[in-house]
Structure formats: C-alpha cells, structure tokens
C-alpha cells in the first residue's frame, strides 16, 4: 500500500495526472448522468476537482485554467451532441461545430473553475470546516455559474428516487450541496489513511468527528426523502384523465427528394393513424390528445389577417385535422404551431413570430394558447443581428408576454346515443380535407356540437422551458395547475444522449410541483411522469420513431409546494449565512495577523 501511495504521489507531479483528473470527472459525471444513470458514480466524480485543488493550492490562474479544461472535457463527453446540433440546425461545417462545442465548454463550464478557485482560497485561509467549505463552494458555483443547457450535480444524484424527493423543499441546488459534502468526505476517506486510522485511537476520534456532520446530513436527506416519498405515494388522486401522446417524427425540413406536398401529406396521414391506433390501445376515448412541438412544422392553424395575407402560414387542412381529431373523439387536442403578430404598428419591420401552443376543445373550437417565453439562444433567436448571416436556419422568434395556464374541457352528454353520435353515419378523415375546405368540415360536424364545461387547468411548457426550475415557478402567479404538459422537439440532436438528458433534467419539475407531467416529443423520448418522478407504467417511446403512447394519468389536488412558493430560499439562505460566517472568520484572521 505504501509503495502504491508513493507511486501515486509521483504520478501527481506529472502533466498526465492533470489529464487523468479531467477524464476522471468527465467520465464519472457522464456515467452518473442519463442515459447511463449509474447514479452512485456522482459521489466520486468531483474527485478531479479536489486533486487539482490540492496540487495547485493557492495558484489561482492555474486553477482557473485547469477548471476550464475540465469544463471542455465534460462537455466533449456529456454534451457531444452539440456537434450534431450545430451541423443539423446551424448548417455549420464539422470543424466549426467542434469549435462551437469547445467554446460552449469554456463559457458554460465556468462553474468548474469557480468551484476550484473558491475552494482553494477558503480551505487555505480558514484551515478548518473543509467539508462544509466544499459544500459551500459547490453550491456557490452552481448558483452563479452561467449555463446555456442548465444541469446541476443534484440532477445526477436525483437518479436515486429517494434523494430526488428532497427537490420539493431544497430544489436541485440542495441536492448539489449534498453531493459535494459527501464527495469530499469520501475523498478524504481514501485508503492511504486507513492504516493509521485503524491503529491510532486519536486518529479514529478525529476521523469520527470529521465524518459526523456529513453522515448526519446524508441521513437527513435519506430520512426526509423516505418520508416525502411515503407521504405523496399515499395521496389519493381526485380524478384521472385518459391521455394520448402522439409522436409523429416530423421532418426538420422537406429536403429528402420528395415533393413538399407528398412529405407533408404523409406526415398528416401518419398523425391521424397514430391517433387512431393509440385510442384503440387505450380502450376508451381519450380526454386529451397531445401533439409535440413542431409536430406539424412551418404551418399555423390560426387564421388571422397576418397568417393569411402578410405571411401565408395558415393552412386550412392543418386546422381541419386538429378539428377532426377533437370531434372524432370528443377530446381536447393540444398542439404546437407557428403564430405571428405585429409588435407595435403594422409594418414588415414589426412582424414577429411566436412558438405557440394552443388547445382545441371537444367541439374543435380554438381556446387558450401559450406563447413560448423563454427562447433558446442560437436556436430561436440570435443575440446580435449579424449572427443570422452565419446561421440562416435560426428563427427570429419573439418571446410571449404571459405565464398563463391552459383550460381544458369536458363534453356534456345526455344519452349514450348522443355520446357515440357521428355525423351522417361516418367521421371525416384526413383525405377528406382535400375536397372539404375548413368551413365545410365545420359545417359537417355542426349537428354533433355539444355543451362543454371547463374541467381544470394545466401548466404548458415548450421544450427547453421544462429544465428551468426558476422559470417554471413563475407560473405560480397564474394559479395552481392540475398537471404539466411539455411539448418538445429534440429531433435536431439526432439519436444522441441529449433526449435522455433533456428528459432527466425536466423530470424534477414533477417532484418540485408534485404534479404529473405529460411529455410529448416529436421524435422521442415521450413519457408520462408521476408526482414522485417515476415513469408511469415504466413506458417511454423510442428515439427517431413514430408512435403513440396512451396512459391514464392522475390529478393530485394539493396546495402549492414549499418549492413552488419559496423556490431556492433554503440554498440561498444557506449560502448567505455560511458566507457571512466565513467572511467574519476571514476578517478575524486578518486582524489577528495585523496585531
């Protein structure tokens, strides 16, 4: 053991040790993250930080440099899909796509050097409470580090369903704090010290004192997680809804050699077929049919002066198909479209586009809509106009103005015959919309109109918004939703790990709000997630597939959770109080030296 220890110490002096640290943190973080989800590796993944912080203790420029390199390696391993996205979405050459990945690692991996420099500074100046210092610095780096695709160490640990329950109180940041506390404890419990701990009574006492706080903190999170899990597992739903998710695998563009009309016709027929097949598997009529973001790309079902004359985006056959699905099953249909409007006086300069979700009620009438508020930089807009010349596929979208919930409806039937009624003996289908214009389609179903009543409200999120916990909290001003619906298009990333990571990062919203989530994606991965963060029926769709997923979801009636009301209050309070304590210690140390 001593010989091995000596060799490791010699190895630490080499540049290869630095590379070893980069790879250690990068690889074990990836293994702990989705889709591999070997969560236990999260506890040792930060060791690379600790080794380099010890090697370059007090050398802040070097710590900053090595922290950046860890960020680049982490991004290259875990977020390698950025290359695919840059090529597919931005139409960039492969070399430029690699440079974009490296730039993302440097810029959005800043939380790594922030941790290493602050940890080296505080552990050196204070000289004690090193475990708490690790947690404090980890929390600090998580809270202030800039990110484009927000992920946190707590997300990696939340693969453990018990620990994940604490997100209801502490948010993901609280779990990140635990990760650094436990990780540093394990780091200091390395085999090199076992011999002296075993043979020295004093060393055993020191070690027991050292691990007491981390052990109590971990135990607190485990006990709290078990309590919350049991509490919410026993909550009875107030009602259930039959939900049908349609995953159409719509193309990103119509450039496969076929005529555009042929491609879009095939897509719309596929949507109709998947809906019918999903309803058959469900065995009953769905209450809610959900289509994903860009399920029907480039078109709008909103007939306005702007979408019909200024920019011809409205397609009556798109509008008709959504209307037909609503009437065929007397169900709510929630789908995505492109909408447009003027910002200010009507003029070409003031024309704006919106990423819009809208609901059609069981009569096919257009109801509430939600325009995406949190737009993705480089995807839906560019921070500077000249950048549009570099990536002409990037949209010019405008953020929505409101955080609003979506109302959904239940038809009122008076007889069984009325419930099963179809006009003139048959329902219209997609092919009929070629000969029936939208007004004719509506007229055909006029005799089947029924009274509908508002049943409840759900929280609508579009794509990226679901991974932003602070943003999702802002919907609390609109009321208390019954469940969450997330419409997403991850096709830009191909068959990479991004879809699994996107799903995993969004899963915690169900726990934070204690609401079931319906996640409908264009090309995968679609799923229903319960209020405990579990996949309902253990069902998920595949990647790059066209399929439907039918499931019954529960509605939990409960007041807003602690996290919904107070957000990251506990992590920020912990950071503030610890910061004040450390500042007081540093001032005392400085005064002691000057005297």
Swiss-Prot record:
Biological pathway: Protein modification; lipoprotein biosynthesis (N-acyl transfer)
Localization per record: Cell inner membrane
Active-site residues, record numbering mapped to chain: 293, 372, 463
InterPro entries reported for this sequence: Apolipo_AcylTrfase, C-N_Hydrolase, C-N_Hydrolase_sf, LNT_N
Keywords of the record: Acyltransferase, Cell inner membrane, Cell membrane, Membrane, Transferase, Transmembrane, Transmembrane helix
Membrane topology reported for the UniProt record: Multi-pass membrane protein
Any one GO molecular function term: N-acyltransferase activity
An annotated GO cellular component: plasma membrane
EC annotation from Swiss-Prot or TrEMBL: 2.3.1.269
CN hydrolase domain mapped to chain residues: 241-555
TM ranges: 30-50, 63-83, 95-115, 167-187, 210-230, 569-589
GO biological processes: lipoprotein biosynthetic process
Family: Belongs to the CN hydrolase family. Apolipoprotein N-acyltransferase subfamily.
Identification of the protein by name: Apolipoprotein N-acyltransferase 2
Gene: lnt2
């Amino acid at each position: 053991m001593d010989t091995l220890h000596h060799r490791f110490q010699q190895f630490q002096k080499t540049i290869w040790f630095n590379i070893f640290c980069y790879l250690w943190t990068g690889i074990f973080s990836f293994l702990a993250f989705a889709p591999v989800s070997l969560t236990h590796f999260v506890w040792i993944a930060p060791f690379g930080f600790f080794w380099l912080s010890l090697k370059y203790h007090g050398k802040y420029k070097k710590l900053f440099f090595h922290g950046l390199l860890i960020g680049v390696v982490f991004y290259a391993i875990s977020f390698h899909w950025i290359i695919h996205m840059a090529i597919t979405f931005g139409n960039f050459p492969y070399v430029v796509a690699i440079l974009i990945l490296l730039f993302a690692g440097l810029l959005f991996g800043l939380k790594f050097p922030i941790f290493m420099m602050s940890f080296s500074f505080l552990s050196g100046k204070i000289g004690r409470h090193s475990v708490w210092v690790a947690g404090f610095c980890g929390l600090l780096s998580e809270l202030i580090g800039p990110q484009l695709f927000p992920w946190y160490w707590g997300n990696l640990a939340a693969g453990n369903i018990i620990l994940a329950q604490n997100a209801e109180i502490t948010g993901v940041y609280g779990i990140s704090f635990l990760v650094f506390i436990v990780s540093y404890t394990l780091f200091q419990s390395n085999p090199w010290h076992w011999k002296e701990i075993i043979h020295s009574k004093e060393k055993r006492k020191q070690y027991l004192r050292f691990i007491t706080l981390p052990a109590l903190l971990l135990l607190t999170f485990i006990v709290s997680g078990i309590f919350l899990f049991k509490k919410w597992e026993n909550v009875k739903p107030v009602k259930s809804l039959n939900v049908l998710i349609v995953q159409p695998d719509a193309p990103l563009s119509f450039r496969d050699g076929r005529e555009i009309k042929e491609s879009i016709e095939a897509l719309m027929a596929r949507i109709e077929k998947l809906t019918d097949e999903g309803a058959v598997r469900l065995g009953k009529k769905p209450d809610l049919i959900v289509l994903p973001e860009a399920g029907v790309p480039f078109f709008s079902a909103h007939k306005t002066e702007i979408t019909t004359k200024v920019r011809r985006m409205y397609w009556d056959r798109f509008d008709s198909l959504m209307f037909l699905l609503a009437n065929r099953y007397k169900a709510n249909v929630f789908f995505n479209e492109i909408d447009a409007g003027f910002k200010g006086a009507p003029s070409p300069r003031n024309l704006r586009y919106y990423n819009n979700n809208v609901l059609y009620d069981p009569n096919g009438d257009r109801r509430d809509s939600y325009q995406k508020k949190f737009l993705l930089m480089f995807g839906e807009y560019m921070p500077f106009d000249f950048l549009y010349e570099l990536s002409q596929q990037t949209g010019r979208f405008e953020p929505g103005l409101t955080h609003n919930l979506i109302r959904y409806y239940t038809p009122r039937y008076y007889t069984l015959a009325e419930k099963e009624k179809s006009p003139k003996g048959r329902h219209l289908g997609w092919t009929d919309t070629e000969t029936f214009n939208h007004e004719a389609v509506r007229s055909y179903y006029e005799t089947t109109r029924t009274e509908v009543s508002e049943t409840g409200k759900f929280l609508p999120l579009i794509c990226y918004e679901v991974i932003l916990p602070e943003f999702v909290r802002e919907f609390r001003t609109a009321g208390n939703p019954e469940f969450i619906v997330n419409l997403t298009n991850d096709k830009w990333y191909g068959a990479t790990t991004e879809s699994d990571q996107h799903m995993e990062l969004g899963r915690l919203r169900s726990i934070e709000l204690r609401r079931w989530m319906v996640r409908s994606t264009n090309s995968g991965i679609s799923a229903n997630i319960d209020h405990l963060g579990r996949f309902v029926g253990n069902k998920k769709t595949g990647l790059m597939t066209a399929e439907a997923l039918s499931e019954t979801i529960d509605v939990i009636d409960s007041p807003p959770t602690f996290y919904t009301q107070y957000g990251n209050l506990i992590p920020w309070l912990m950071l503030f109080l610890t910061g004040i304590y450390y500042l007081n210690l540093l001032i005392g140390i400085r005064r002691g030296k000057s005297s």
